[in-house]
Structure formats: C-alpha cells, structure tokens
Amino acid sequence: MNALTAVQNNAVDSGQDYSGFTLIPSAQSPRLLELTFTEQTTKQFLEQVAEWPVQALEYKSFLRFRVGKILDDLCANQLQPLLLKTLLNRAEGALLINAVGIDDVAQADEMVKLATAVAHLIGRSNFDAMSGQYYARFVVKNVDNSDSYLRQPHRVMELHNDGTYVEEITDYVLMMKIDEQNMQGGNSLLLHLDDWEHLDHFFRHPLARRPMRFAAPPSKNVSKDVFHPVFDVDQQGRPVMRYIDQFVQPKDFEEGVWLSELSDAIETSKGILSVPVPVGKFLLINNLFWLHGRDRFTPHPDLRRELMRQRGYFAYATHHYQTHQ
C-alpha cells in the first residue's frame, strides 16, 4: 500500500444475486474477483453462437459485439455493467473468469468465442501484429529459441504492461489458458500499482515522465519505435504505467541505471500475487494499474502450455493517459 491511494470497500456485495453467473473475491486478493458463468449460461451461449465459427469473428468484426450481446442477454444484462464497474474501479480492476463446462483444449474455439464476447462488452480488442488477428494464440514448450521471454519456460517472465511498443492505447489485457500438459509451476503473477511499496519513490523521480524509446523484436512484427514515459496519470491524477523491461531502450547511463533499479524494485515487491489459472479460465485486468508476468515452470520434455491473449481499449470511459495520448 502507498500513500497515493487506498483500497476502497470491496464492491462485491455478499447479498447481490446475479443472473447467469456468480461473483466472489479471489483467495489471493480482494482486488481480484472470480466470475463464474453457470453451466446453463455456458450451454445456452455456445448453442446460440454455434452458427459462427471463429473465422467469422475474425472476418466480421461486428460479430464480436454480437456474441457479447448474446452473453449479456443471457445474464439479464447484468454482466456488462458489472464488468465495466470492476475494471474501471481502481480498488479492483481484475477478474478471473470461468465458464462451467469449458475446460478442455478440444473446446479451444469455444474458449475464443467466450473470451471475445466478454472483451467486447467492455471495448474492442486491438489488432495483434504478432498473429495478424484481434487475438493471438501461442505455445510454451520445454525448449524455446524465440527472441523474447514470452515463450521461455524456465525463467520468470518479469512483470510488465502490455501495449508498450505500439501506438494504440491498451486499457485491458485478457489472458486465457487453452491447454496445459506436463506442467508444474508457471502461475500468473500480478501486481497492483497501489500495492507496490516503491511506487511513490519511482513515480516522483525526474525520469518518471521522460519519454523513452520502446522497440520490439522481429517476432512482434512491429518495425516502428514508439516514445512515451514509463509513468503517467489518469483523469484523477493517479499513477498509471506503460512499462516492459525487455523493450525499453535507455538512451544513456542515467536512464539505464534508473530502469535497472525500477526493474529490481518491481520484481522484489511484497505485493506480488501468484495466481493459478486452470485450462478454460482467463484473467482480465486493467492494464493501466496492474502489471502482469509469469512464474517459471518445472522442466519436463513434454511440457506444453497454449495461451490466448486479447488486448484493447475501453469503449465506455476515458481512463487513458493524460499527457501522452
């Protein structure tokens, strides 16, 4: 906890009954809520969207909103306002979402449809240059020769924000577990900015607002560098971040030393949450004030994990960076 903001009362009302889903605080933190669609809701949703294969959602972007409306209607139109309220609430801003009956890699297309529906109730997912679609699926195996830490299993993927090397605002990040075989470890790691004990120190540093260069490796299919500061503020003047240690390119000694100290202070924070995400579940977080990463895996020759991500902008509120749009 730092002096800039304090945890508000948990928005989860123990007396609130929702139609089509349940909502409870997670075991890891009251900031992270667990939302579970009932078996009936899941079954009805999949039946009503069965006519559209994933390719249809790729080709016709308005269908992504159509499937979102179907899901919200099945939840008596309580889902969309709940999602927005939670993700825009500084005291929370994170959900672990599950649909009863979706828990096997054979249902990968159904997983994409469900995640797409949820994401497009809060905004729109951006084009992902790595995959050429509005979402990306990628596999982590025991041996990796890629050019970033995204697929490397035997080391921690450090905490970061998404969207640091693109010009589009990235308000939310969705990360879904599609498959997992011979896996031990590899929990998702999360850190809320207001639980980072060193936030005040780094946010008030002169380099916090200096635009820095961010450049992505070839696998990201992004050739243009972008410039922005590591820190900014939201409409209420509260700190937000746009940071990843792999892609920020310090121009001089001063920036390099400061960024190294920043990285160490984040990775050693006592506020980091370790969250298991079973197959079929996904995390949905506010990317402006949550950092995310991944713990290391135990080596195994047949280790395999497949993930799906979406990241995009909120369409119903303007909680963007104030000085570097």
Swiss-Prot record:
- Please report which protein family the annotation says this sequence is part of: Belongs to the glutarate hydroxylase family.
The record's comment on cofactor binding reads: Binds 1 Fe(2+) ion per subunit.
Which pathway does this chain act in? Amino-acid degradation
Gene Ontology molecular function, alphabetical = ferrous iron binding; glutarate dioxygenase activity; oxidoreductase activity, acting on paired donors, with incorporation or reduction of molecular oxygen, with 2-oxoglutarate as one donor, and the other dehydrogenated
- Organism placement in taxonomy: Bacteria, Pseudomonadati, Pseudomonadota, Gammaproteobacteria, Enterobacterales
The organism encoding this protein is Escherichia coli O6:H1 (strain CFT073 / ATCC 700928 / UPEC)
Quaternary structure and partners: Homotetramer.
Q: Where does Fe cation bind?
A: 160, 162, 292
Task: Give the gene symbol.
Answer: glaH
Q: Does the keyword Iron apply?
A: yes
Described function = Acts as an alpha-ketoglutarate-dependent dioxygenase catalyzing hydroxylation of glutarate (GA) to L-2-hydroxyglutarate (L2HG). Functions in a L-lysine degradation pathway that proceeds via cadaverine, glutarate and L-2-hydroxyglutarate.
Q: What is this protein called?
A: Glutarate 2-hydroxylase
Give its E.C. classification number: 1.14.11.64
